[in-house]
Amino acid sequence: MKKTIFTGSAVAIVTPMNEEGSINYDNFADRIEEQIAGGTDAIVVCGTTGESAAMTDEEHKECIRFCVEKVAKRVPVIAGAGSNDTAYAIQLSKEAEALGADALLLVTPYYNKTSQRGLVAHFSAIADSVSLPIILYNVPSRTGVNISVETYKELAKKNNIVAAKEASGNISAVAKIAAETDLDIYSGNDDQIVPIMSLGGKGVISVLANCLPTETHEIASYCLEGDYKKAAELQLKLLEFTNDLFIDVNPIPVKEALNIMGKNVGECRLPLIRMEDAKIAKLFSSMEKLGLTK
């Protein structure tokens, strides 16, 4: 029986930046405390939302170390350690394990356009290099490669590959993964928490939780309790805002939203830039309806 890393809601936490572009660790500490106080069940550091692709090696390690220290075992810390370079992904994974992370989130290799056999070889090599439990992250809209159900089945044979973060948007594929593997499944899309959890998913790895940790936790909790009616009502209440968090490339809108809320997380690093005024106005409007504007 594979160990479940968490049930409920995990936040794919943003990395706050100072005006000149350095990481704002004081603000980062505040965001971590806010998440734990809001009921978040796990924290994913150095993921897509955390701008890991724009970090140096040292920053990546320091963010993981800092998060592990501040969380202090109150909830699991899941470290993003994926790369399109297998050797580098192994290095990141070993470093995350040494720094005290509780689990790893490994995105599929991007840009290389490897085959399904290549995905098996890539993830197997990483799994063999560490003892931490691993969540595979499937987000073909960003990486250009999709993990097939057959590949999931093959990778599930590895003892420490325990879960999938599914952001493909393909509910039929999620159903097959649930039916044909023993992997825990987490929704990687905030607008699909209820359908994925109704198929046996264990929770969500969420962008929305950066702004609404309690509500995101409640949606997942209702699902875990079997109250899909309440879960759906809350998910639909937040749907316009949820959609507007992806009105531009993640994490541009969620950082804008947090700044509108007065959290002062700064802007994204280049090559990501602040979105256009019309998009900001649309985001502000959906936030205003929920009472989230300062």
Per-segment meaning from a language model:
Residues D85-A96, V174-A175, D191-L199:
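Catalytic cores of alpha/beta
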Residues L104-L105, L136, N159-G169, L183-Y186:
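Catalytic beta/alpha-barrel core
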